[in-house]
Regions:
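Sec-dependent N-terminal signal peptides
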Residues: 4-14
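Intrinsically disordered, low-complexity terminal tails/loops enriched in metal-binding residues
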Residues: 18-159
């Protein structure tokens, strides 16, 4: 129940903070390649979402070798509300709502004070928390099986 409330709270906060509307992006999202403001017409599919770019050139660079930009792309998926956090990005354990750090406008929650301290000490929080390793185990589409499976695995592991 607490996990569902955290997910609902995160979704509500994301919607309010970023002013997302269906089919529109009003967030000041930056291009994952150049860091410039995006053109909402320039995007490509990535994982189960869309990554936005400032121009067709950056889009082509990403499509040619996305591996160089996965951390920034993962961050953008969360910043635009296409993905939500389901567990602690460092341990994949259940989050606690009061263990939170803001990463460039995105709230990331943790399971304990140790993980929170590690994140706060990091000089590159985006790389630490949105790399493919941490992203794949801790983030998923809202109401997705990935989020539900992650919760189920932890519960069954305790038995």
């Amino acid at each position: 129940m607490k996990r569902q409330l955290i997910i609902i709270f995160t979704l509500a906060l994301s919607s309010l903070a970023f002013g997302l509307e269906e089919g529109k992006i009003e967030v000041k999202v930056k291009c994952v390649i150049s860091g410039d403001e995006i053109d909402k017409e320039e995007y490509t599919k990535y994982k189960d979402g869309k990554v936005y770019f400032c121009c067709g050139g950056c889009k082509s660079d990403f499509e040619a070798d996305a591996s160089k930009f996965t951390t920034a792309a993962n961050y953008q998926l969360v910043a635009t509300g296409q993905y939500v956090q389901g567990s602690c990005p460092l341990t994949a354990r259940k989050n606690k709502a009061d263990k939170v750090v803001a990463v460039d406008g995105v709230s990331v929650t943790f399971c304990c004070n140790n993980c929170l301290k590690k994140a706060k000490k990091s000089t590159d929080k985006v790389s630490m928390l949105f790399s493919d390793v941490t992203f794949d185990k801790s983030f998923g589409k809202p109401n997705s099986d990935a989020i539900k499976t992650n919760v189920s695995k932890k519960k069954s592991a305790k038995k």
